[in-house]
């Protein structure tokens, strides 16, 4: 018989750096998940891309066991990395903080493709360009 799902937990954790401190500990503790076991498994799975923010969806079952799926880093984080910035603009319509090339946008779109609801890479590029625009990053042709 299949296990009964009692909940989902969505978190964004730096890859390879999960620890029982907030926000991970309290979120998992509420559902009764073994926090250290999750941290060990997550860190082992994500150690290759250490430091990048990694979204994770944790499925918690009635017997307090869990499974998790890691997703690709948010487009905003990838754009900041490509543009070599610390953060986006506070006023993106007035202050532009950096630039990225169309080729960099294409690379990000191809990387994000499994997690986006775009039909093709061109649609994914448009989504990434919209994120860049909202962060005050200019996309050059």
UniProtKB/Swiss-Prot annotation:
One of its GO terms (molecular function) is large ribosomal subunit rRNA binding. It comes from the Bacteria. GO terms for biological process: translation. CDD domains: Ribosomal_L11 (cd00349). Keywords: Methylation, Ribonucleoprotein, Ribosomal protein, RNA-binding, rRNA-binding. One of its GO terms (cellular component) is cytosolic large ribosomal subunit. One or more lysine residues are methylated. InterPro entries: Ribosomal_uL11, Ribosomal_uL11_bac-typ, Ribosomal_uL11_C, Ribosomal_uL11_C_sf, Ribosomal_uL11_N, Ribosomal_uL11_N_sf. The keyword Ribonucleoprotein applies. Belongs to the universal ribosomal protein uL11 family. Forms part of the ribosomal stalk which helps the ribosome interact with GTP-bound translation factors. HAMAP family: Ribosomal_uL11. Part of the ribosomal stalk of the 50S ribosomal subunit. Interacts with L10 and the large rRNA to form the base of the stalk. L10 forms an elongated spine to which L12 dimers bind in a sequential fashion forming a multimeric L10(L12)X complex. This is Large ribosomal subunit protein uL11. It comes from Chlorobium phaeobacteroides (strain DSM 266 / SMG 266 / 2430).
């Amino acid at each position: 018989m299949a296990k009964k799902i009692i909940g989902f937990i969505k978190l964004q954790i730096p890859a390879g750096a999960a620890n029982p401190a907030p926000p991970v500990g309290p979120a998992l503790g509420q559902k009764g998940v073994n926090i250290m076991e999750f941290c060990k498994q997550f860190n082992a799975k994500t150690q290759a891309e250490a430091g990048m923010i990694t979204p994770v969806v944790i499925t918690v079952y009635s017997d307090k066991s869990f499974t998790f799926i890691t997703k690709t880093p948010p487009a905003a984080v990838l754009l900041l990395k490509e543009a070599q910035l610390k953060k986006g603009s506070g006023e993106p319509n007035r202050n532009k903080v950096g630039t990225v090339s169309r080729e960099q946008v294409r690379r990000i779109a191809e990387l994000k493709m499994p997690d986006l609801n775009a039909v093709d890479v061109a649609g994914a590029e448009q989504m990434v360009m919209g994120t860049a625009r909202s962060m005050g990053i200019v996309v050059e042709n």
